[in-house]
């Protein structure tokens, strides 16, 4: 079995593969205060809950955009799984030609998504990852990483509205029944939700225009993307495990 780990700013997502089959996946909060022992015991507990044997894990692959947690995570993996993890970074074989001014600036999560997206759907392709930040990645018909867009995620937008406007409350992220809100909370929810959907669709269309390619497919992934996909007019498909699949593929290309 292969354990893949995607470390994001808000969540750590883990998946276990047997060959190409995803046996289980879990989501933990990204807590920089956790010790390696706490993290290790959490991972052991997840395996036990699914009745999976941690001893059958032969490799661990990690992609991270949170450097401060990496020492703790690596130590937990070494101590509790007895494996030196493969960390996605410069020098890792991906099969993707990165056409960025400085390829080292591209986040590991974006590269992993590009690998999975092109393998599963082909190109041209736009991948929208709706996490703490929302990222848009453009992939050419030849599988080249062309670049993309980074903007605040929907949760950051909602939280900023609450923190910076004295009379506005904190809101739950839900799809409102109508655009026209009938009270403060529904008005805020409408602005945050429909404003975010509009942002996604507008940026996707601008990227398509600049790519100059026909039949560009748009794939969404990330925490809130299912709800956004249902409302979006540009997203073709929602894939909740895209990043995990990309980690598996990169592992296979490096063994």
Curated annotation (Swiss-Prot):
Which pathway does UniProt place it in?
Cofactor biosynthesis; coenzyme A biosynthesis; CoA from (R)-pantothenate: step 1/5
Q: Specify whether Metal-binding is a keyword of the entry.
A: yes
Enzyme Commission number, as recorded: 2.7.1.33
Any one cellular-component term (Gene Ontology) = cytoplasm
Pfam families in the record, alphabetically?
A: Pan_kinase
Q: Which residues bind substrate?
A: 100, 107-110, 184
> What's one GO BP annotation on this UniProt entry?
coenzyme A biosynthetic process
Keyword check for Calcium:
no
Q: What enzyme class is recorded for this protein?
A: transferase
State the source organism's domain of life: Bacteria
Query: Which key words are in the record?
Result: ATP-binding, Coenzyme A biosynthesis, Cytoplasm, Kinase, Metal-binding, Nucleotide-binding, Potassium, Transferase
Reactions catalysed: (R)-pantothenate + ATP = (R)-4'-phosphopantothenate + ADP + H(+)
Binding of ATP occurs at 6-13, 132
Q: What broad class describes the main subcellular location of this protein?
A: cytoplasm
State its location(s): Cytoplasm
In terms of InterPro entries, this protein maps to: ATPase_NBD, Type_III_PanK
Extract the coiled-coil ranges from the record: none
Q: Give the Gene Ontology MF terms in alphabetical order.
A: ATP binding; metal ion binding; pantothenate kinase activity
Quote the record's binding site residues for K(+): 129
Co-factor requirement: NH4(+); K(+)
Query: What is the protein's known function?
Result: Catalyzes the phosphorylation of pantothenate (Pan), the first step in CoA biosynthesis.
Q: How does it assemble?
A: Homodimer.
> Which PANTHER family does this entry report, sorted A to Z?
TYPE III PANTOTHENATE KINASE
Q: Report the protein name in the record.
A: Type III pantothenate kinase
Organism listed in the record: Ruminiclostridium cellulolyticum (strain ATCC 35319 / DSM 5812 / JCM 6584 / H10) (Clostridium cellulolyticum)
């Amino acid at each position: 079995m292969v354990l893949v780990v995607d470390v994001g700013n808000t969540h750590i997502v883990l998946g276990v593969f047997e060959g190409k089959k995803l046996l289980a996946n879990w989501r933990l909060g990204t807590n920089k205060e956790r010790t390696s022992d706490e993290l290790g015991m959490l991972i052991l507990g997840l395996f036990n809950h699914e009745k999976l044997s941690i001893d059958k894990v032969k490799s661990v692959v990690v992609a991270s955009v949170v450097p401060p947690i990496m020492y703790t995570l690596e130590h937990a993996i070494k101590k509790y799984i007895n494996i030196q993890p493969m960390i996605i970074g410069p020098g890792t074989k991906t099969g993707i030609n990165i056409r960025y001014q400085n390829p080292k600036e591209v986040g590991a999560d974006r590269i992993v998504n590009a690998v999975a997206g092109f393998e599963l759907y082909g190109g041209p392709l736009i991948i929208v990852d709706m996490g703490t930040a929302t990222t848009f990645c453009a992939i050419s018909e030849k599988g080249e990483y062309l670049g993309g867009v980074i903007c605040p995620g929907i949760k950051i937008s909602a939280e900023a509205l609450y923190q910076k406007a004295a009379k506005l409350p904190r809101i739950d992220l839900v799809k409102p029944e109508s655009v026209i809100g009938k009270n403060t909370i529904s008005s805020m929810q409408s602005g945050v939700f429909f404003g975010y959907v509009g942002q996604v669709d507008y940026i996707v269309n601008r990227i398509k225009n600049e790519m100059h390619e026909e039949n560009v497919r748009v794939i969404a992934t990330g925490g809130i993307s299912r709800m956004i996909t249902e409302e979006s007019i540009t997203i073709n498909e929602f894939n909740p495990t895209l990043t995990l699949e990309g980690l598996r593929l990169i592992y296979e290309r490096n063994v």
